[in-house]
């Protein structure tokens, strides 16, 4: 809940600034403002998640008890995601209906009160809801690693995920700082560069920490596979959604003959990438 509150406060503070930067200075400056605001939410989610796990572990000292922490995070994610989604969609539909039936009031006109509710719903659902969802996933991943590590390696298996997650946060902070310092010609390539930088730092740290904690490089190899699969999934998503590649161009050509061919082409392109998104994590585990 604290991460969601911080995210909504930062979102409302950075929205207008991002718009002003886009009008006055262009895309590059607006991207920096948007990235800085989004980074606050990301670091709040990871920071609160890791802090909560560390505090609970220091108090109880038993990794199996930590699963209750994950259940609490899942409950908040459920209410924030579902409740925020229902509110957002209700306000969105209401605003669209007013724009259709009221003469002289176009869609997203600020004179329509439902438009304000729609914007509030976007913050609740897309910021607080998604932040709670990511918080639950992040905490669950750390806790499951700690429980499995404790059952196999004892205290070393508990400390390793905590230390590596802390290094990951520091690597992300460094990558975000480098992003804000450079001039962005292509937003997508600049964002991908932050992923590559933070991933490389985590890889180096894993090869240093794995022998110290376990006496071998097996954990580091698993981390390498996980990072590579994550990057591969992102690249495959880009191939099927970017206008640079043939799939999107083919869907655009099919759309010229009507909505039916657009839907058919979209489904035929989406099914293969769904298969790869399902099988790649499974192959990674195997």
Regions found by a protein language model. Name each.
Residues 1-278, 283-284:
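Hydrophobic packing and interface segments
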